[in-house]
């Protein structure tokens, strides 16, 4: 399958992306609705989840991505592999995130990962970054107690901002005393993670437990 060419960054504040995510019928998506759920926000081409769904078939995976051509491509690959524990959905998680979150199978959201999000370096573009306080509040409401939030970026200032926003909410407890978590908690690295290491550059990670 030919690789889809898309813009690396899209403005999540533009009118095109200012609509709530339309949840599918999850009963038509997942073969076993009783399995715990891992939500990956900003999944890009979905390669991380396509591998994770095969490595951990006892978990359901959901990838959210704002670039629709990548979602179409990822779902085509999911179908080709016959994965019934994985779905990719197009949308902006910072527009009424509760609509999607409340539609998910109840008491199943155990993992949330946000990995290498678009940094939007300029301060005037800070509202375009994915980890906004409203998203943190919504995740706190719908995640299962004892669940996990995993964050990583190759931009230290962005990793710090994400970490501080989760740390500011009483439902999320940071799990390490060191400034950054050394190892990825998942058995599969993202494409950006591999690229960063190949360049000899650091990755900044944080891990939170849900109260």
UniProtKB/Swiss-Prot annotation:
Its keywords, alphabetically, are:
Methyltransferase, S-adenosyl-L-methionine, Transferase, tRNA processing
Alphabetical list of Pfam families matching this protein? Methyltransf_4
Q: Which pathway does it take part in?
A: tRNA modification; N(7)-methylguanine-tRNA biosynthesis
Name the catalysed reactions.
Answer: guanosine(46) in tRNA + S-adenosyl-L-methionine = N(7)-methylguanosine(46) in tRNA + S-adenosyl-L-homocysteine
Q: In the UniProt entry, which residues are flagged as the active site? A: 118
Top-rank lineage group of the source organism:
Bacteria
Q: What class of enzyme is it?
A: transferase
Residues binding substrate are: 122, 154
Check the record and name the Gene3D superfamilies matching this protein.
Vaccinia Virus protein VP39
Enzyme Commission numbers on file: 2.1.1.33
* One Gene Ontology term of the molecular function aspect: tRNA (guanine(46)-N7)-methyltransferase activity
Q: One cellular component GO annotation, for this chain's record? A: tRNA methyltransferase complex
InterPro entries associated with the record: SAM-dependent_MTases_sf (IPR029063), tRNA_(Gua-N-7)_MeTrfase_Trmb (IPR003358), tRNA_methyltr_TrmB_bact (IPR055361)
- Quote the CDD domains the UniProt record gives: AdoMet_MTases
Q: Which PROSITE patterns match?
A: SAM_MT_TRMB
The entry's S-adenosyl-L-methionine-binding residues are: 40, 65, 92, 118
Under the heading HAMAP family, the entry gives: tRNA_methyltr_TrmB (MF_01057)
Primary role: Catalyzes the formation of N(7)-methylguanine at position 46 (m7G46) in tRNA.
The similarity annotation says: Belongs to the class I-like SAM-binding methyltransferase superfamily. TrmB family.
The protein here is known as tRNA (guanine-N(7)-)-methyltransferase
Q: Which organism is it from?
A: Microcystis aeruginosa (strain NIES-843 / IAM M-2473)
Q: Which gene encodes it?
A: trmB
């Amino acid at each position: 399958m030919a690789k889809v060419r898309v813009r690396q960054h899209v403005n999540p504040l533009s009118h095109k992306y200012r609509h709530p995510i339309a949840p599918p019928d999850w009963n038509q998506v997942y073969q076993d609705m009783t399995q715990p759920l891992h939500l990956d926000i900003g999944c890009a081409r979905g390669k991380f989840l396509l591998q994770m769904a095969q490595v951990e078939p006892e978990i359901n995976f959901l990838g959210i991505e704002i670039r629709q051509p990548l979602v179409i491509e990822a779902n085509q690959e999911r179908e080709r592999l016959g994965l019934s524990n994985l779905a990719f959905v197009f949308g902006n998680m910072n527009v009424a995130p509760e609509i999607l979150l409340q539609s998910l199978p109840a008491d199943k959201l155990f993992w949330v990962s946000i990995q290498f999000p678009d940094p939007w370096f300029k301060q005037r573009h800070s509202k375009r970054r994915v980890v906004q306080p409203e998203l943190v509040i919504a995740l706190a409401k719908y995640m299962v107690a004892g669940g996990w939030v995993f964050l990583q970026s190759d931009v230290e200032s962005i990793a710090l901002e994400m970490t501080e926003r989760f740390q500011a909410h009483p439902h999320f407890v940071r799990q390490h005393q060191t400034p950054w978590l050394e190892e990825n908690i998942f058995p599969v690295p993202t494409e950006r993670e591999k690229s960063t290491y190949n360049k000899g550059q650091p990755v900044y990670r944080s891990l939170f437990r849900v109260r």
